């Protein structure tokens, strides 16, 4: 094998490695970027940093309900605070499960009373001031801290923006 040919093969291998690494970084960025920045969704402002709790310290965030998520295979939850039009506080949570079945198990265990099915992700329910949906191995919950006529369309818009960012 000539020196020039070896150099050619090494160049191709290097290009393949760079492309593969870039694809991996894009997937990681997409997952960590599931929370829209301020102004990306009309009326919504991100009011704090994203916090993440892994399975070992999930109880610090959802004390009393962590066991249900652990049994369903939760890996972590990321959470972020928002404010809608300067007056309605809300929190958005993205639970990363080991499988889509785990996300489905938690989704199906949620109460269906007073819920309206909506088209988002694989399955979604809209309540008076909250939205829960699942997409692949992710379960997302958005809760607004007051109820008003504009809250439901607002959390639907935020939810759709988040669903677009989640991998299938």
Please annotate each region the language model reported.
Residues 2-12:
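Bacterial N-terminal signal peptides that target proteins for export
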Residues 100-135:
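Short, internal acidic amphipathic alpha-helical interface segments
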